[in-house]
Swiss-Prot record:
Domain of life, per lineage: Bacteria
Residues reported to bind chorismate: G315, T316, Y434, R454, G468, A469, G470
Catalytic activity: chorismate + L-glutamine = anthranilate + pyruvate + L-glutamate + H(+)
Lineage: Bacteria, Pseudomonadati, Campylobacterota, Epsilonproteobacteria, Campylobacterales
EC number: 4.1.3.27
Cofactor: binding comment: Binds 1 Mg(2+) ion per subunit.
One Pfam family it belongs to: Anth_synt_I_N
Binding locations of Mg(2+): E348, E483
Keywords: Amino-acid biosynthesis, Aromatic amino acid biosynthesis, Lyase, Magnesium, Metal-binding, Tryptophan biosynthesis
SUPFAM superfamilies, per database record: ADC synthase
Name of the protein: Anthranilate synthase component 1
Length: 500
């Protein structure tokens, strides 16, 4: 592999730059500090050279560029599998005989296809982000590893996973006010071509002098749902009966809201403006658009320190606002105090922190919890949050840790598998991207990902906004229905702002 690296003048308008580059198989990841809301980094995948799709036990790797085709040949040799119709098709069989939970992590799985992207490259990249894969793990990725039913996709059709390998990447550091443009070349024949692509990106970045200007279209402002309040409340009561029977302690029940969405990038602009979050993302595939502003880390792994982090969020209150919709700081402080001292919310949160600690225990030799029961605030809601940290055991990597963790207890329940079975029965359709994760893996072995919440899946100009609520024995059904709408509201408002 040949690493190509260019420096460029700082550009404070990543979305304006991405607008010029937006096409299928591109993405924009951004981050903002929780307290100050200041933007910290932006990562733009300007061109992908490979696309990886996982459906059940089959991973299909397709080249998107001639450079990607050269790498596909090397992957074919690495996996000892021939290329068929410009694609590498890898099949994985689940070993049902292994009983040890730790040993299960090392059984062959579709995750090995992602590992192969990095293991097959013998030359260490000059920059850890020159070789980078980014994408989406669906909620149903778990089904390969656990004995769970396979549901049909009705709204959100994201595959078990879909990842891209970057050919051209732009990293903007808003703190350091620096820009790096990276290229991954897998054959000497394409070095000149990719070097020119980086120069073109550099010139394009220099030309961006102002921020993104959102667009508006004639579209309906109406919102519908796949489940009415009354039906959702019945499902809450059904889960509470299972809790009384001792089947589960908690489950996260969700429903979907639907809107017309013709201007996805503009809706993302409004979302990140009103709801700056640690994880903001816009992914454009050939089949769909996925964007969001997630407050919750799925798994963050630093290969240099060998530490993994999980950031459980559970416990929600509306922000304190006046009649005009502005923050009333006295009322907001009262809402924060009420959240921190609510027995039901605290008990639910501590239970999910314990679940996160147990997930971390499978792969870590040392672990601890800090920032216990802290409050993070966003545009419409505030949350109780904690942070669980662990040092991974020898032989474990980021994907072993992710396998141990998925799916987040804050999006499934406790006990996790029992809760998911009940969720599948009640929701009766694939969640797709919702409750899964969006993130990246780089060549040094690090991973950063967020839980796919506060997100919108758009296909054929139809937006699907899914939101859930944690159900425990003390839950008030109407309150839980209201909570799902409150969590979806930031997305609904963002899309409405793109309507004429």
């Amino acid at each position: 592999m040949i690493s190509l690296i260019e420096k460029a003048p700082y550009i404070p308008y990543p979305l304006a730059l991405y607008e010029k580059l937006e096409q299928p198989h591109t993405l924009l990841f951004e981050s903002a500090e929780i307290e100050s809301k200041a933007h910290t980094k932006s990562l733009l995948m300007a061109k992908a050279c490979l696309k990886l799709i996982c459906n059940h036990n089959i991973v299909t790797i397709t080249s998107l560029t001639p450079n990607g085709g050269a790498f596909l040949q090397k992957l074919s040799a690495f996996f000892k599998t021939p290329i068929q119709d410009n694609a590498l098709i890898l099949t994985y069989t689940k070993n049902k005989k292994t009983q040890d939970e730790f040993l299960k992590l090392f059984e062959p799985s579709p995750f090995d296809a992602l590992r192969g992207l990095f293991k097959s490259v013998k030359t260490k990249p000059k920059h850890p982000f020159t070789l980078l894969s980014a994408g989406v793990f669906s909620f149903e990725m778990l089904n390969f590893f656990e004995d769970l039913p396979h549901l049909k996709a009705k709204d959100n059709t994201v595959h078990d996973f879909i990842f891209y390998l970057a050919q051209n990447l732009i990293i903007i550091d808003h703190k350091e006010k620096s820009v790096e443009i990276l290229g991954a070349c897998f054959d000497e024949r394409f070095k000149t071509e990719i070097a020119q692509e980086l120069q073109d990106l550099k010139e394009l970045a220099k030309s961006i002098k102002s921020d993104f200007v959102p667009k508006k279209s004639k579209q309906s402002r109406e919102v519908s749902a796949n489940c009415s309040d009354s039906e959702f409340e019945k499902r809450v009561l059904s889960l509470q009966e299972e809790i009384k029977k001792g089947e589960i302690f908690q489950a996260v029940l969700s429903r979907s809201f639907y809107m017309e969405c013709l201007e996805g990038l503009s809706a993302y602009y409004h979302l990140k403006l009103t709801n700056p979050s640690p994880y903001m993302f816009y992914i454009k595939d050939s089949d769909f658009i996925l964007f969001g502003a997630s407050p919750e880390s799925a798994l963050k792994y630093n290969a240099l320190t060998n530490t993994a982090e999980i950031y459980p969020i559970a416990g929600t209150r509306l922000r304190g606002k006046d009649k005009q919709g502005n923050i009333d700081y006295d009322l907001d402080s009262k809402m924060e105090f009420d959240l921190q001292h609510d027995y039901k919310e605290r008990a639910e949160h501590i239970m999910l922190v314990d679940l996160a600690r147990n997930d971390m225990a499978r792969v870590s030799k040392k672990r601890y919890c800090d920032k216990l029961l802290k409050v993070d605030k966003y545009s419409n809601v505030m949350h109780l949050v904690s942070r669980v940290v662990g040092e991974l055991k020898k032989g474990c990597d980021s994907l072993h840790a992710y396998r141990s963790f998925m799916n987040a207890g804050t999006l499934s329940g406790a006990p996790k598998i029992s809760a998911i079975r009940l969720i599948y029965q009640l929701e009766n359709q694939r969640r797709g991207s919702y409750g899964g994760s969006v993130g990246y893996l780089n060549s040094e072995g690090s991973m950063d990902s967020c839980i796919t919440i506060r997100s919108c899946f758009v296909k054929n100009n139809r937006a699907v906004i899914q939101a859930g609520a944690g159900i425990v024995l003390d839950s008030v059904p109407q309150n839980e229905a209201n909570e799902t709408r409150a969590k979806a509201q930031a997305l609904i408002d963002a899309i409405r702002k793109t309507s004429l």
